[in-house]
Every structure is written in C-alpha cells, then in structure tokens.
C-alpha cells in the first residue's frame, strides 16, 4: 500500500503580486497478491486520486480531479512441458473532472463575470491475454489486447448549474489487437526473432449540445 499528498499555495512574483496557482493532490494505492500454488499468481490493485488546481494562465480552474482505477492479473505457469505460461489482465479506470470559473476564484478575475463549468468524464476498460509456449530452441508468444475508451461531458454556460444535467456522449474508441512472436535459437551465437501484430480501431464521435 502507498499514499501521497502534495499541495502548494499561491506564490508571489518578483513584484510581490500573488499568482493564482495553488494545487492539491492526494493519492492512495492498495495492491494484494495471492499464490495458491507455486505456479499460480493472483493480484489485484486499486488506485484512488483526488485533487484540484488553480491556473493563472486560463479562464477556468480545475476544481475537481477525481480518478479511480482497479485491475486484476492472473498468471499460471508450467501448465504442460511446452505450455509454459498463461497470463490474463483486466482493468478499469474512471476519471471525473470539473473545470469552472467560480469554485477557486472570484468571478471578477481575468474579467470573467459569467459562471461557467465543464464536467468531462471518462471510462476506460482494458484487457490482455497472452500465452507462452516453449520447445527446444523455440519460444512462441501469442495473445490478444482489448481497450474500450468512453468520453462523456456536460456543461454550465450561464450559471444554471450542471449537476442536474445528463451527460452527453462525445467520443468512444474500441480497439482489438492480436499478436504473435516467435524466437528460434539456431546456435549459441545466433537467434532469429519474428513477429506480427494486427489492430482494429473503431472511433465514434458526437457533438456536445
């Protein structure tokens, strides 16, 4: 397990003027592992992050930076004399951000008098499966990858609030990939390696209303 906390207040420039630049970030991570047999491994990880940041160079501040992520991993070794390893991984992360003009500054700053906010949200799912085979002088690895990346958002333009509004889709990405790599040890001084990978990506875009 691990934890970290970082923060800083606004600093002053060479003329003693306060610069809008404070930030805070809190992170926690927990990882557990289990080995039911000498050839089997199970692990699980959870990560949590919370933060906020003030920006002197733009019209909005990051009043909410939330991220939650988890993943699991399974490894089985020495399944047969030639099927040496099977690995499976799956994970998910969720990001919830808020950028606004009023939570961390006065509305009069930078000449902005209107309450505005953007609330983007993102969810990513990933998967990975790999098998390893070994014969005398030959090693073969093959597997598949998967990723699903979903983006949503909602906004506030005239102080009407955003929390009651539904999220609108912005863009989605789906990726499937397959790979194979083989290695042949011809002699103590010669080794030949060859591989192939194929990926298919689908992208969908929507306009935020």
Where are these regions (language model features)?
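Periplasmic-side early beta-strands and strand-to-turn transitions of outer-membrane beta-barrels
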Residues: 1-65
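Face-selective signature of the C-terminal outer-membrane beta-barrel domain
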Residues: 35, 39-49, 67-209
